[in-house]
Amino acid sequence: MSEIPADLSYTTEHEWVQRTGDGTVRVGITDYAQSALGDVVFVQLPDVGSDVTAGESFGEVESTKSVSDLYAPVTAKVIAVNGDLEGNPQLVNSDPYGEGWLVELQTETESMQAGLASLLDAEGYRAHVAD
């Protein structure tokens, strides 16, 4: 069974979301997603300062098996991208919830709270991947 940390929120598209401040979150793909993808060879991420829209694609993860879109969990501005992935994309496989994070996003606290409220908790995500 894939690792599903209880302290994170999840999307049905297999991204995890970790609140890092009042209006900020860190986003990555889940252990389930990286396992299904296989060996990640390239990650395309947006530029810092870009706006992303909840439910819309903001980048791609390319593996030896396929290319998968990344979907924004909330509408926000990109405030950081994981530059380590450029030279070491396999971090997404080896540490999806740590060193393999993708982007950090920022929005107004109220918007963030509303966006996070629509996400799955660990049990909800576990049920989603079990289907």
UniProtKB/Swiss-Prot annotation:
GO CC annotation terms, alphabetical: cytosol; glycine cleavage complex
GO process annotations (BP): glycine decarboxylation via glycine cleavage system
Cofactor remark: Binds 1 lipoyl cofactor covalently.
Cofactor dependence: (R)-lipoate
N6-lipoyllysine: residues carrying this PTM: 65
Keywords: Lipoyl
InterPro entries named in the record: Biotin_lipoyl (IPR000089), GCV_H (IPR002930), GCV_H/Fam206 (IPR033753), GCV_H_sub (IPR017453), Single_hybrid_motif (IPR011053)
Domain of life: Bacteria
Domain Lipoyl-binding intervals: 24-106
Family under the similarity heading: Belongs to the GcvH family.
Protein name: Glycine cleavage system H protein
